[in-house]
Amino acid sequence: PEKKEYLPVVSEEKRIFIERPDALQSAVRMGMLSLDRNHPDYLKFRVLVTLFGGYFGSRLMSNIREEKGYTYGISAGVMPYPGQGVLAVNAETANEFVKPLIAEVYPERDRLQNDLVPAEELSMVQNYMSGEMCRSYESAFSLADAWIFVQISGLRDSYFTDALDAVKNVTPEEIRELAGKHLCKEKLKEVVSGKKMS
């Protein structure tokens, strides 16, 4: 039988609300179509997304959790499905904080598009990502799984070396350029599931 392609479907709506009248908290998801692993920008884009919301010291965590106190945790990540990736921001928050939480995501995106990331902050993310990659492939079994992944995904044999090089060598200027190209505010959809607030 012929293999079917299943790609994410994009809603025309900017905001989607799913009411749960008895919910004590709301689940917030913001997302857009993004890059897959074969895109030439993907490996350095991962560094941008990690800065944005991919680790505990990220921009989103520092602002929305640490400074504003709207949530215990907020994250951003790329799900690189075959043919089409998805960028998603995830958080849970008290119902009354939904709107201010969402509103704070956009200025953090703007900062990445307009300002150069300080060298110290970029270095911290590079060290974090390099360490995570090394820990992920430190056993024979994890290396074997990684090799299988490369083969079934149709990636280059040098994929993991390329990934480490991208993390080590990306510059603040490239981060700003990637944010301008791939973090489009107009394409970012907002989905909330929780109690309706007036």
Language-model features, listed with the residues they occupy:
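Non-catalytic beta-strand/loop surface segments
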Residues: 1-39, 50-103, 121, 146, ...
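Charged phosphate-binding loop/patch that engages nucleotide di/tri-phosphates or the phosphate backbone
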Residues: 192
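Conserved nucleotide- and phosphate/pyrophosphate-binding catalytic cores
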Residues: 91-94, 106, 132-133, 137
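Short acidic/His-enriched helical or mixed secondary-structure segments at domain edges of catalytic enzymes
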Residues: 17-18, 66-71, 112-161, 165
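Double-stranded RNA-binding/processing signature
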Residues: 42
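A common structural junction motif
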Residues: 1, 107-116
